[in-house]
Regions:
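Structured beta-strand segments within beta-sheet-rich domains
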Residues: 271-299
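Boundary/junction segments of secreted and surface-exposed precursor proteins
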Residues: 224-245
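Short coil-to-beta strand junction motifs in C2/discoidin
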Residues: 138, 255-260
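Short amphipathic, basic-aromatic surface patches that mediate peripheral association
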Residues: 246-254
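Propeptides and adjacent flexible N-terminal/non-core segments of secreted
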Residues: 99-101, 253-256
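Carbohydrate-active catalytic/glycan-binding domains of CAZyme proteins
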Residues: 1-228
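Short amphipathic beta-strand and strand-loop transition segments with alternating hydrophobic
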Residues: 74, 230-235, 276-283
């Protein structure tokens, strides 16, 4: 589906609720607004109301806390509880987003590489959980996905790296480093906009009154497609055909906007490398498109 940055501004400050670093906002189970900052949180019933400062409680449950409890990121789970990832890559859960967070993992969930990880961001859509973490020294980020928010799969390749900010007319923005990623989600939970803190040099070379600068930039994201598997039986290696409905959306007509012959279906480990199931037939269903794939090679 086509998308543009829906919240790209311009913005202006309207009030200061307090001090803090590396904030992230979410809504707790009781629908109150929560602004996390390192070593604390602000809570309010109303964005324009009174904000109360406090601290989260943490229970490591005899597990090692990796790199301290900072740069936290939060997502609501299917049962309305909350999952949190800390800078070190530990996974924590809370009953309602404000009550005690308990650590579930005893090791980091990040890729098994020698990275200097920070600024994780976690979110959930209608299918699964997503996590992106930045290697600040290597200036590269990694993408992970999970069905339960605890056990994660690292997808190959880079989530982002310098050079990703390119306009539709081909003009590129030459930022040295991208950090502090946050995502804006649609009603399905899909990430449709990425917000970055960017800078055009090393941080310690950005001096007062010089020509260097840090900015917040927004980049629209492809949200992916709304897919429904129509078959009632689970997919196995012996499945002969797979029927998938591609749902129409505002600004997207699957019957005209898709190169059907380019479609592949299957496990990410297959499709990401150009393999997977190939299209056999298609049929229109109202505004939607139903695609029948050969089941061979689904992974």
């Amino acid at each position: 589906p086509k998308t543009a940055c829906p919240t790209s501004g311009p913005f202006k400050p309207v009030r200061i609720i307090g001090k803090g670093h590396n904030p992230e906002m979410f809504r707790a189970k009781d629908r109150r607004y929560v602004v996390y900052v390192i070593d604390g949180r602000y809570v309010s019933d109303d964005l324009n109301g009174k904000w109360e400062y406090g601290k989260f409680d943490f229970n490591a449950r005899d597990r090692r806390i990796i790199e301290g409890l900072s740069n936290l990121s939060f997502a609501q789970r299917e049962d309305s509880s909350y999952v949190m990832v800390c800078r070190g890559g530990g996974i924590w859960v809370s009953r309602d987003g404000l009550s005690e967070y308990n650590q579930l993992t005893d090791r980091r969930v990040y890729p098994d590489v020698d990275g200097r990880f920070e600024d994780p961001v976690i979110w959930r859509d209608h299918i699964q959980y997503h996590l992106i973490v930045n290697d600040w020294l290597g200036r590269i980020a990694f993408y992970l996905r999970s069905k339960d928010g605890v056990n994660w799969v690292v997808d190959p390749g880079e989530a982002y790296m310098p050079g990703v900010a390119v306009h539709a007319d081909g003009q590129a923005e030459d930022w040295f480093k991208y950090e502090r990623l946050k995502v804006y989600q649609d009603k399905y939970g899909r990430a449709i906009q990425a917000n970055f803190a960017v800078i055009d040099t090393l941080k310690n070379e950005d001096k007062p009154f010089d020509h260097h600068s840090s900015k917040n930039i927004s980049i629209p994201l492809n949200p992916g497609l709304l897919l429904t598997i129509l078959d009632e039986k689970p997919i196995t290696s012996g499945t002969k055909t797979i029927r998938v409905k591609i749902q129409a959306e505002e600004g997207f007509n699957p019957q005209t906007d898709i190169d059907v012959n380019s479609l592949r279906f299957g496990a990410s480990e297959e499709v990401n490398y150009g393999r997977g199931c190939q299209v056999l037939t298609t049929e229109n269903a109202g505004k939607d498109l139903i695609v029948t794939f050969n089941g061979k090679g689904n992974g």
